[in-house]
Amino acid sequence: MLIAFISDIHEDARMLEKALRSAHTLGAERIFCLGDITGYSPINQNFATEKNAAACIDLLREHCEISIAGNHDMFTARRLSEFTAGIHYPGNWYDLSFTEKQRLTGNKVWLYEHETDPRLSPDHIEWLRTLPEIACIDAGGMKICLTHYIYPDISGSLIMGHEPTYDALEHRELYRCDLYLSGHLHPNGCIVQGKKTAHRWVNIDFGEKYSVETGDYLFAPACLRHALKCGILLLDTVTKSVLTVKLMN
């Protein structure tokens, strides 16, 4: 079975369409999204006239089996994560001023001050509110854990994580799956950590096939226009290998 993972779209409907087309053309039987469907910032992206969060949501609803909530999706939907990573969020968090949020969290969390309004309908917002922060799926005899980032910061809301190597070990202990898939990091290709890498975080370039082992943690590439880093991750459950496919702008 071939499975496609798409992540970190940030309202780039054009690249999402390319990603879905590529996944179907290559024979993906199942498609999953690892979060950050929304979240456009002119500081980080340069396709303001083409951003379309609503179109992205509609495409994912049609083509993806499960979409995971990322930190930007949580912000857009005014949701608080179930996994706070030690941060106390008051119930009126989204009504507080920027400076008050900074004061309460010690500048430890993303506040999204540069993001533009995604102009979503109430139906689209409600859909974002229903997205799971974690999903465990069965595919080709493998149990796979899907999150946007690593426990305890499952949604990826912290500006700086805890200690990712230790957190990944704790993540495995909690969810007990064969593979772990996340997004959030926007790697050039994918990042893998496991026994074969001596638990170091190793980058696997686009187009390079990697044989996975039980317990491996993988980070999929982002799916938004970028000169080097746009693509999808494919998992072949028969050969137990992954391959990242670069998408050209």
Residue ranges and their predicted role:
Residues 6, 11-107, 111-112, 129:
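Core catalytic region of metal-dependent phosphoesterases/phosphodiesterases
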Residues 6-7, 31-36, 66-71, 146-147, ...:
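Active-site neighborhood of phospho(di)ester-bond hydrolases with catalytic His/Asp-centered motifs
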